[in-house]
A protein has these predicted regions:
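C-terminal tail/extension regions appended to the core domain(s) of diverse proteins
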Residues: 1-74, 78-92, 97, 212-295
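Active-site beta-strand-loop-beta-strand hairpin of nuclease catalytic cores
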Residues: 145-186
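Conserved catalytic cores of phosphodiester-cleaving nucleases, focusing on short active-site segments
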Residues: 141, 184-190, 202
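A short, acidic, amphipathic alpha-helical segment used as a generic capping/interface helix at domain edges
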Residues: 207-210
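Short, flexible loop/turn elements at secondary-structure junctions
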Residues: 145-147, 191-194, 224-227
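Acidic-basic catalytic patches of nuclease active cores, encompassing PD-(D/E)XK
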Residues: 58-162
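Active-site-adjacent loop/helix micro-motif of nuclease/hydrolase catalytic cores
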Residues: 151-155, 193-205, 216, 230-233
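Short, conserved, surface-exposed binding loops centered on an aromatic residue
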Residues: 133-134, 176-181, 212-214
């Protein structure tokens, strides 16, 4: 099932021209639109990566991107559909899961206090100047976990004492305490590529999710199609503010980098960097993401 969902994702990336060829303003050869056009290595690995994906989809050729298309928004939509597809087939566990595109953080139990904080900052200019807008975060994609009736959880699990387990978000009967809001189980940030500003934005979002919550920290993940190992390392390396970076086609990228190093042995460190991140559990393929989200 995961293999089929991954294959559908790759097919849609090409068929819907999300992963596509981009004409250069200078009139030179078209480049794959995940490449850094100013970096020859990035252009070559992106081309090798796209060709490996194309061969697996059995589409005849890579198409030209749609003029004015926002790859980031299209990428988010594809990843959201992939997660809905996969999580709907994962082994059942306590609570019901829902994949949602970018609701405000104060829609979730751990962050409900941000609603009042926003109201106060709207009313008081000095507070607004002090706080700024760092707390106003809308993750690209979230996985929400909904509270359950006691009957769903099982009387034997809770026992018959009404004075027990009154603070947990998972019990719907605790609605008076937390408005029966869903729990933010995971945040999935979608970054089509990882230029330095995008990597830094992802880190800032992650730190705000950690700092601003009351209760458990959600899983904090990033999905990308970035072809350059050094750019992946800019986000994957670090102290663990992000759980893990997931590549939309890691196995194909590993093959593309191997081919590139065969062509240019001086770039052997590209392959070494990629292997180091995978070995260190900082980088994984998107097929791992559904399992990690429910574990």
């Amino acid at each position: 099932m995961i293999a089929a969902a991954r294959a559908r994702l790759h097919h849609r990336m090409l068929a819907e021209r999300v992963l596509a060829l981009r004409p250069q303003r200078s009139g030179g050869a078209r480049v794959v639109n995940v490449a850094d056009t100013d970096n020859a290595g990035s252009r070559r690995v992106a081309a090798l990566l796209a060709e490996r994906i194309r061969r697996q989809t059995e589409l005849p050729s890579l198409l030209e991107e749609i003029p004015g298309e926002r790859q980031g928004a299209s990428f988010e939509h594809l990843i959201s559909d992939f997660l809905k597809d996969c999580l709907g087939h994962m082994p059942p566990s306590s609570g019901s899961w829902e994949v949602l595109p970018g609701p405000a953080l104060d829609s979730f139990a751990q962050y409900r206090h941000l609603r009042e904080l926003k109201r106060l900052s709207d009313e008081h200019e000095e507070l607004r100047l002090y706080l700024g807008s760092a707390y106003v975060i809308r993750p690209d994609i979230v996985v929400a976990r909904h509270p359950m009736e006691d009957e769903e959880l099982g009387v034997d699990l809770i026992g018959r004492g009404d004075d027990l387990a009154r603070a947990t978000f998972l019990r719907k009967s605790n609605a008076a305490a937390h408005l029966a809001l869903p729990v933010l189980h995971a945040s999935v940030s979608c970054k089509w590529t990882l230029r330095s500003d995008r990597a830094q934005n992802a880190r800032t979002e992650a730190l705000n999710l950690i700092r601003d919550r009351k209760g458990r920290v959600p899983a904090i993940t990033v999905v990308t199609a970035e072809p350059m190992p050094s750019r992946l390392a800019s986000l994957a390396d670090g102290t663990g503010d992000i759980d893990r970076v997931y590549h939309v086609a890691l196995y194909e990228l590993q093959g593309a980098v191997q081919d590139f190093v065969t062509e240019d042995p001086t770039k052997g460190y590209w392959e070494e960097d990629l292997a180091r991140m995978v070995r260190g559990l900082r980088l994984a393929d998107i097929s791992d993401l559904p399992f990690d989200l429910v574990s």
